[in-house]
Regions:
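Extracytoplasmic electron-transfer domains, predominantly the class I c-type cytochrome c fold
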Residues: 336, 551-552, 559, 564, ...
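Beta-propeller blade signature
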Residues: 249, 290-301, 356-371, 421-425, ...
Length: 779
């Protein structure tokens, strides 16, 4: 006990030093609205709620990001010491394509039936199949125009102070985490839904009145929750993910069941997605180790499967594997758990995670009894673009060659629909992988092939071209053309120290919201965004970044003329989803980009499009020379200390009006027939939904374009698509718009549907500045 207390005090002192004293850390805190005093207070909250180990992890991740960087053990001034740069010539000598052949009809097993056909919504996403489908058909395409609001529930007032919300370190330190992303579950006339301030609610699903409300000590049900079937509701249990494992809660009373697991908890790490409950075990997904099974009766650990492979003897790398944060589904007959996984870490730069990074960016099947991986299918190998698979896998049954077969489906950020046989993980259509570009970063070893699927047809292409540049106005077009000048674009172009890359897919394509499947026409419905991003890689200073260098000649001129944009420590400044970006100057003396400092005309030409002319005129050739020498001298010192590292990040490409840098529309709903692999219809959300004063000739600023869309489908032959504040219902066969309704706030989770006393209801959750539930029925 004494040892633990001493350790806690030491950790608190060290973390306090990191958060409060180090200047660059304070800047990062202030960027999200926290001053050092608030940061210190929140550190106490983190320690109290997360424990020592998780606090260390969070502080490392949030603040000392350079601990995860790829540090160099060689000198940048000695090119002979550089690690090998990949040979493009050698890459091009390989076969153009690699094909994984489709499964034959003889190999496929007979279908066990459509287990997703039910009228219950006892697990988020509609059940263990995650199909977001219901057999309910009282509300259908003929009468949907008669929908009316049955009830509304508001759990919070507007204008929440996000820093008063006690949750995980992630929740406290995140800039924008005030969304309920869990679609409610309904048992009889009880609805269960979390709130943004870490409460779990039980609401009367017919009247919208509150039954009970409990607050958990950790972030609650971020992406889903599950009810365990029980004929005696008073003894039934909810399994609720949190930032500290999964809670078992009595569904009737809302009390934590302290006699289960570890005082009502199983697992001890961040869990985002809905657990799977079987007769013998409860399956949960954790950020680490990955997938765990616990005894249903006692909460005792049965097995634990890690999908993360740590790099030996490397303190700079946290993860090199996959995190199952997107979702999972369960096949009762096969006793298989299907999981999608995240990308490898560190992101963007993979020097110290060589190889394909097995199990990352993959769809996997895990045996229920043993926890062993039965098979895995990787979409993107050695990911450098944040192309993880975020959408929950869907279990569906389709017909091929007059034979019904069971498949698992996952839609991806780059526009692919992974359609695999559930038994062996083989594709239903040939899966083609095309030869991919090499990297110009020393030591980076890219994957030779990346996906280029023909069927199912891609619902989106991740490649950005000049033709995609915005056409909203000439001013906005010119602004984007300037931002992509000298940018790399093309099929899986790799991150570079010399150039940005511009692409679609960093935030979707398809995201965690997932797709829905309707068995009536074997069609999957995919909501997605098509908004461009840029990936930037730069050198970073791992040791000397906080040194003042005021004794160096040129220091004052740099601080006066350059620091406001490039930062006092030369790291650059940017906003991930904003218009502003200023590049890092660290290590520029070792890059071709130094020509912009070596040549006064180059410097003026480049900056004339960025800073006011009157400010530019104040900088003479002599001033630039002093500034250049100052920067180069620091670079030499960093190199001498072998303190250079490399870092990568991404930011949304937006124009000067804060609109996405690509041509509208930006949000879509697409329908793909899984038996043919063909797109059968497409809906494009109108641009005027996201423009301020869109009726005027002069385009003003864009409103925030929603990052994600949501969907749910029913036997009534309708599919609901959600875009921002708007709910829209479509005919599943042709995509005709049947009905729409606009709420006061953006919706933040897929809808749920249920029936009670012969009446079908559909419920929607919207959140951010408040927490609203709006439920409809036929009038």
């Amino acid at each position: 006990m004494k040892k633990t207390l001493i350790t806690s005090i030491i950790i608190l002192i060290l973390c306090s030093y990191v958060v409060i004293i180090k200047f660059d850390i304070i800047n990062k805190i202030n960027n999200i609205g926290l001053n050092p005093k608030d940061a210190f207070y929140n550190l106490f909250l983190i320690l109290k709620k997360e424990g020592i180990v998780e606090t260390i992890y969070i502080v490392k991740k949030k603040f000392t990001h350079d601990l995860r960087l790829n540090g160099f053990d060689y000198s940048l001034s000695n090119k002979d010491s550089y690690p090998e740069i990949e040979s493009n010539k050698k890459r091009l000598s390989l076969p153009l394509n690699k094909i994984i052949r489709k499964i034959s009809s003889k190999e496929t097993k007979e279908s066990f039936g459509q287990s997703y056909l039910n009228d219950k919504w006892h697990r988020s996403h509609g059940g263990n199949s995650s199909a977001k489908y219901s057999v309910l058909e009282q509300i259908n395409k003929k009468n949907i125009k008669n929908l009316e609001v049955a009830w509304k529930y508001k759990s919070l007032s507007n204008n929440i102070n996000r820093y008063e919300i006690a949750g995980t370190a992630n929740n406290i330190l995140s800039e924008n985490n005030l969304n309920v992303e869990t679609n409610p579950i309904i048992i009889g006339n009880r609805m269960f839904v979390p709130t943004v301030d870490n409460h779990l609610l039980s609401i009367n699903a017919v009247t919208g009145t509150l039954i009970w409300k409990i607050k958990l000590p950790y972030m609650v049900a971020r992406r889903g929750l599950t009810w365990e079937e029980n004929k005696d509701f008073s003894k039934s249990r909810l399994f609720v993910p949190s930032s500290k494992g999964v809670y078992a809660i009595n569904a009737q009373s809302g009390k934590i069941l302290k006699d289960f697991g570890n005082k009502g908890q199983i697992g001890n790490q961040l869990s985002l997605i809905a657990p799977i409950v079987t007769k013998e075990s409860i399956i949960i997904a954790l950020i680490k180790p990955a997938i765990e099974a616990y005894d249903t009766k006692t909460g005792k650990l049965l097995w634990s499967t890690s999908l993360i492979k740590k790099v030996k003897n490397d303190k700079n790398v946290f993860l090199t594997g996959a995190v199952p944060w997107g979702g999972m589904s369960f096949d009762e007959e096969r006793k298989k758990i299907y999981v999608v996984t995240g990308n490898a870490r560190p992101e963007v730069v993979g020097i110290k995670r060589p190889g394909d990074n097995k199990y990352s960016n993959s769809l996997l099947a895990i045996d229920l009894n043993s926890g062993k991986v039965d098979w895995s299918f990787q979409e993107v190998a050695h990911d450098l673009w944040d192309f993880d698979i975020a959408s929950p896998p869907i279990l569906a049954t389709i017909e091929k060659n007059s034979k019904k077969i069971d498949v698992v489906v996952a839609v991806t950020k780059i526009g692919n629909t992974l359609l695999l046989d559930r038994d062996y993980g083989k594709p239903i259509f040939d899966a083609k992988f095309k030869i991919a570009p090499t990297s110009d970063i020393p030591g980076e070893k890219t994957a030779a092939y990346q996906p280029s699927f023909n069927l199912p047809e891609m619902f989106m292409d991740s490649t950005f071209t000049i033709k995609d540049v915005t056409n909203i106005s000439e001013i906005q077009k010119k602004n984007i053309l300037l931002k992509i000048q000298n940018s790399k674009m093309g099929f899986f172009e790799t991150p570079s120290l010399e150039k940005k890359i511009t692409l679609f897919g960093v935030s979707g394509g398809a995201q965690w919201t997932g797709a829905s499947f309707n068995p009536f026409n074997s069609t999957i419905f995919i909501p997605y965004t098509r908004v461009p991003w840029q990936i930037i890689v730069n050198y970073t200073d791992l040791k000397l970044r906080d040194r003042n260098f005021s004794n160096f000649d040129g220091h004052n001129k740099y601080q006066l003329n350059c620091a406001s944009c490039h930062g006092f420590n030369r790291e650059g400044k940017y906003k991930a989803d904003g218009n502003f970006f200023s590049s890092s100057l660290i290590g520029i003396s070792f890059l071709n980009k130094k020509n912009n400092l070596d040549n006064f005309n180059n410097f003026k030409n480049m900056h004339s499009k960025i800073i006011p002319n009157q400010n530019l005129k104040k900088i003479s050739s002599s001033d630039l020379n002093d500034i250049k020498n100052y920067i180069y001298k620091i670079d030499k010192l960093i190199d001498k200390e072998k303190a250079f590292g490399i870092n990568g990040f991404w930011k949304k490409l937006v124009d000067n009006k804060n609109c996405p840098g690509s041509k509208p529309p930006w949000l879509f709903l697409k329908a793909i027939n899984l038996e043919t692999g063909k797109i059968i219809w497409n809906y494009e959300d109108p641009i005027n939904s996201y423009m301020e004063n869109s009726n005027k000739k002069d385009v003003s600023k864009c409103k925030k374009v929603p990052n994600y869309g949501f969907t749910m489908t029913t036997a009534g032959k309708i599919v609901f698509g959600i875009f921002g504040k708007k709910i829209k219902a479509f005919d599943i066969e042709n995509g005709n718009l049947l009905w729409s309704y606009e709420l006061d706030e953006d919706l933040s989770a897929p809808p749920s549907t249920y029936e009670y006393n012969g009446v079908q209801y559909i419920t929607f959750v919207s959140s951010h500045t408040s927490n609203n539930i709006t439920t409809f029925k036929l009038r």
